[in-house]
Each structure stands twice: as C-alpha cells, then as structure tokens.
Regions:
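Interfacial segments of multi-pass membrane proteins
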Residues: 24, 37-42
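Short glycine-rich loop/turn motifs that provide flexible caps or phosphate-binding loops at active sites
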Residues: 23, 33, 130, 134
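Hydrophobic alpha-helical membrane segments of integral membrane proteins
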Residues: 29-34, 49, 53
Length: 161
C-alpha cells in the first residue's frame, strides 16, 4: 500500500484556474460542488468527510494566487473569454498556475494530514505540485487547440476590442 500519492497530471487544477480567472467569484460554487461530488462518485461516503475541507483549500489557493499576481502587477489579464488572447494573458495564467499549485500542494496536504492523522511526505507535496502544473498545462493546451479549430471552422469569433 503506497497510501496517498496524488496525481502526476491533475486536470481539475487547470479548470479551477481558468474558470476562476474568467468568471471570478461566480465560478466558486460550481467548482466547489464539482470538487466534492466528483470524487464521491468514485469512492465511498467516508471520502466526503475530509475532502470538503481540502476542496475549500484548493479553491482558496487559486483565489489567493490570483490576488497575489494582481497585487504584484507582474501581469495584467483580459477578463473577457471572447477577446483575443495575448502574451500578458498567458503570463498571468502561468503565474497563477504556479503559485496556486504551490499553495494547493502544501495546504491541501496539510489539511488532509491533520484530519486523517497521517504524515504526508515531501515527495507527495512535490507530486501534487507537479501534477497541478502539468494538468493545468494540458488543460489549457487542449482549450487553445479546441478554440483555434473552432475559429478556423468559423464556429467561434474573436472580438478585437
């Protein structure tokens, strides 16, 4: 039994980042419900007890990361999903992905270890961080390819404002 190891490519972290960046606070209830109901379909009800708290920390990691990047003014972000994407948008998303993955890997595992009374090693935290970053990159790459194909087939139009 290897215990809790985390995912090496965790796609939902990319969903958290994209949905919060584009839709703001309005996305949080839907993201939270997805966080707690998705795993409960796979595992038993016991899973729901401690994951509700861990899900809150995962979502707060993204919120805090967005606020840190906004506060630092390292990059600005175009908050309209229909406008043309530029380098500043990618830079903003990359910073949010890295910072939120770091916070998520540390604080979610801290909460899980406190509630479950188990020690979680540094390799698990590193695996969470790598999984969140890689999953976000895969998710965003998929969206870029999909929207590019939709635009080429004239099923989607970019506003130039």
């Amino acid at each position: 039994d290897k215990g809790w190891i985390g995912s090496i490519v965790y796609l939902p972290h990319g969903c958290r980042v994209i949905f919060y960046c584009f839709f703001g606070v309005r996305a949080l209830p839907a993201l939270y419900l997805a966080e707690i109901t998705g795993p409960s379909l796979v595992w038993d009800e016991k899973y729901l007890d401690y994951w509700t708290y861990a899900s809150i920390s995962s979502l707060l990691a993204v919120v805090v990361a967005v606020e840190i990047v906004k506060w630092s003014r390292v990059s600005t972000f175009n908050y309209n999903i229909l406008k043309k994407v530029n380098f500043a948008n990618y830079k903003f998303l990359i910073f949010v992905i890295i910072i939120s993955a770091l916070f998520n890997s540390i604080f979610t595992n801290l909460i899980l270890s406190i509630i479950n009374g188990v020690n979680i090693g540094v390799e698990v935290i590193a695996r969470f961080f790598i999984g969140d970053v890689l999953g976000s990159i895969v998710f965003i790459t998929f969206l870029m390819i999909m929207f590019n194909l939709l635009q080429q087939r004239r099923l989607y139009k970019v506003h130039e404002d």
